[in-house]
């Protein structure tokens, strides 16, 4: 079990002192990969994924047996600005759908053999409208981080985090804009499907929020412009690092949460891979800024952890080949 988060300074220190991969396990995995019954590099990126996974799990011949998918839900005061095509009550309704097994992520988690958990964060108390005030107080940010931090099962061996929150592409765009600059329009997309006028309004809201909150510190950006579910995802990603659990990032909103961590500690995302590139236009740019090449690009724009869950079976396949294939010596095959 991880210690509870007591304050933001402690969280910042934990990010800075996070453990790295096991060098011996990684070296052992690289050596094993060179002995498997295939031409060098024939499995392409699957080989890299298996070696990366082995290093983080501290096992040169690992298995993936206990993946966990966590969906965090939150509501946003900035929806008062008309940034979403859907009303905020949909968040509550979708949480019920998750709990009853009726959402896309339920099916995808089940297909991947993953445990799925749902955490709703004070849905009856939205964050503040960030065009008027910081989205959260320091205590509220800490509570959201702690929710994610405590949600990770220490027995899990792979983690996907997802979200549900009407309007949450707006804070995600604001976080990306604050951290990486450019114009608000570079980071703002249609989300759940706003029209041209809605997109112009949403872009204005992002620009106003970033102009109002001038700090570019990762945790301050998360506090002033983020949301509870976005902060909870960040907390879960950080907890997984402490536990050496590899993480598959989902779409634009999840990646924005991850970017806030990377702004605090440069290597904070070394234990993560990008599950997919979503249809939200700025996601590709954000992934490039973080140096993450997506495993999939299927035009998804659902959220919920859906793209990350789809990528579980890619990572499972990579590890299965690495750990299950015979070596040339074992198979009695000449390696040339």
Curated annotation (Swiss-Prot):
Catalyzes the synthesis of alpha-ribazole-5'-phosphate from nicotinate mononucleotide (NAMN) and 5,6-dimethylbenzimidazole (DMB). Its EC number is 2.4.2.21. Keywords: Cobalamin biosynthesis, Glycosyltransferase, Transferase. The active site is at residue 304. GO terms for molecular function: nicotinate-nucleotide-dimethylbenzimidazole phosphoribosyltransferase activity. Pfam families: DBI_PRT. This is Nicotinate-nucleotide--dimethylbenzimidazole phosphoribosyltransferase. It comes from Ruegeria pomeroyi (strain ATCC 700808 / DSM 15171 / DSS-3). The keyword Transferase applies. The keyword Glycosyltransferase applies. The lineage of its organism: Bacteria, Pseudomonadati, Pseudomonadota, Alphaproteobacteria, Rhodobacterales. It catalyses: 5,6-dimethylbenzimidazole + nicotinate beta-D-ribonucleotide = alpha-ribazole 5'-phosphate + nicotinate + H(+). PANTHER family: NICOTINATE-NUCLEOTIDE--DIMETHYLBENZIMIDAZOLE PHOSPHORIBOSYLTRANSFERASE. InterPro entries: Nict_dMeBzImd_PRibTrfase, Nict_dMeBzImd_PRibTrfase_bact, Nict_dMeBzImd_PRibTrfase_N, Nict_dMeBzImd_PRibTrfase_sf. Pathway: Nucleoside biosynthesis; alpha-ribazole biosynthesis; alpha-ribazole from 5,6-dimethylbenzimidazole: step 1/2. Residues 20-41 are annotated as: Disordered. Belongs to the CobT family. GO terms for biological process: cobalamin biosynthetic process.
């Amino acid at each position: 079990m991880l210690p509870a988060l007591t304050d933001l300074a402690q969280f910042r220190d934990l990010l800075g002192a996070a453990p790295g991969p096991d060098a011996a396990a990684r070296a052992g995995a690289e050596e094993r990969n060179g002995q498997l019954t295939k031409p060098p590099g024939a499995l392409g990126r699957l080989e890299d994924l298996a070696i990366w996974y082995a290093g983080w799990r501290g096992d040169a011949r690992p298995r993936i047996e206990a993946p966990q998918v966590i969906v965090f839900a939150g509501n946003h005061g900035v929806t008062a600005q008309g940034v979403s095509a859907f009303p905020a009550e949909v968040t509550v309704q979708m949480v019920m759908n998750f709990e009853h097994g009726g959402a896309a992520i339920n099916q995808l988690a089940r297909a991947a053999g993953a445990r799925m958990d749902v955490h709703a964060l004070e849905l009856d108390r939205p964050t503040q409208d960030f065009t008027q005030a910081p989205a959260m107080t320091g205590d509220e940010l800490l509570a959201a981080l702690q929710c994610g931090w405590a949600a990770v099962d220490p027995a899990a061996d792979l983690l996907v985090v997802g979200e549900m929150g009407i309007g949450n592409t707006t804070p995600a765009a604001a976080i990306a804009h604050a951290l990486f600059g450019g114009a608000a329009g570079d980071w703002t997309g249609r989300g759940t499907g706003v029209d041209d006028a809605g997109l112009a309004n949403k872009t204005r809201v992002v620009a106003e929020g970033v102009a109002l909150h001038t700090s570019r510190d990762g945790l301050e950006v998360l506090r002033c412009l983020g949301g509870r579910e976005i902060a909870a995802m960040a907390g879960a990603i950080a907890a997984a690092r402490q536990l050496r659990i590899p993480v598959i990032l989902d779409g634009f909103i999840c990646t924005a949460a991850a970017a806030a961590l990377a702004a605090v500690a440069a290597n904070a995302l070394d234990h993560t891979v990008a599950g997919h590139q979503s249809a939200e236009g700025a996601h590709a740019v954000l992934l490039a800024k973080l140096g993450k090449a997506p495993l999939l690009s299927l035009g998804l724009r659902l959220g919920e952890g859906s793209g990350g869950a789809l990528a579980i079976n890619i990572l499972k396949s990579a590890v299965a080949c690495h750990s299950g294939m015979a070596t040339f010596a074992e198979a009695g095959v000449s390696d040339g």
